[in-house]
UniProtKB/Swiss-Prot annotation:
The active site is at C164. The keyword ATP-binding does not apply. This is Chalcone synthase LF4. The primary product of this enzyme is 4,2',4',6'-tetrahydroxychalcone (also termed naringenin-chalcone or chalcone) which can under specific conditions spontaneously isomerize into naringenin. Pathway: Secondary metabolite biosynthesis; flavonoid biosynthesis. One of its GO terms (biological process) is flavonoid biosynthetic process. GO terms for molecular function: naringenin-chalcone synthase activity. It comes from Ipomoea batatas. Keywords: Acyltransferase, Flavonoid biosynthesis, Transferase.
Amino acid sequence: MVTVEEVRKAQRAEGPATILAIGTVTPANCVNQSTYPDYYFRITNSEHKTELKERFQRMCDKSMITKRYMHLTEEILKENPSFCEYMAPSLDARQDIAVVEVPKLGKEAAQSAIKEWGQPKSKITHVVFCTTSGVDMPGADYQLTKLLGLRPSVKRLMMYQQGCFAGGTVLRLAKDLAENNKGARVLIVCSEITVVTFRGPSETHLDSLVGQALFGDGAAAVIVGADPTPAEKPLFQLVSAAQNLAPDSCGAIDGHLREVGLTFHLLKDVPSVVSNNIEKCLFEAFNPLGISDWNSVFWIAHPGGPAILDQVEDKLGLKPEKLRATRHVLSEYGNMSSACVLFILDEMRKASSNAGLGTTGEGLEWGVLFGFGPGLTIETVVLHSVPIKPGPH
């Protein structure tokens, strides 16, 4: 007779969950941040609000963003004038776009990750799909499974309305799934489009305007599994994962799904809340490893905005190069909510390889990935890099 303990042991993987492939994609429509205020105030019929436009121009100039990608083209916005008002009922039209385009963009990212992984998609055992862009039943996880032609027995998990911390959440969940199910291969997809949040300017709600200056569209996919086979190419190991609510931060970041779409609210002191709580999260994550020098690890932080990065850098005494990959993704894509940290992982491993560094983590062994979002919620993932094998010359 087999015991429960023996069954459990047989079910578990031997080694830690490992990232085996990463794929990223954006919509084709690219918007230049320097000219975006002119476009935004024209398309929303708000050019008469000259003072507000000047304010928005300053927000865009200070955003450290060069360009963003958006599914919403001028043509789509002209077909849906309600999107361009500040508070016009428009949820049906927004949903009609989101329920189709979110899984479609996610599929492109997933195909890219599967191609890099190099294994048959029939080996995917679990799907975790994450989006803050629209809700539906059956969800985007179901649509993705159909679009990719995955097995009907694939185990799906759908995460809606988590916000900007969720890139850390999906890695935490994938870690648990991979390590507790021997042979599991988990496909994570974060797909975000601003169709639910885009709206015209308001003189009384400047936090909404901040969102219009920062958010962009993108999808990222990651394949996670433990005990890689010789045919698989490990990129990062997921060593530990934690989630914390910052004390006294209620209302710091809120989003509410209404007839007008997803409304976005934030307090001015979000950068302070993050920077005041980050050291405690770092200490709890790295104390077991005997690490207390935050410059000795590689960094992947959700780039909520430049002020958050500046305050974190200042509070922890980080060298400017620590947030290079993070700032690069902010500059090239804007804030893509949950997808951002996965884009940064991709950027880091590619830049590390191109620079001839010894590991996927900028030549360093240990690293941290942070997600920040509504709550205020902080996700902390400890990563272990993988040695880069020199390619053929």
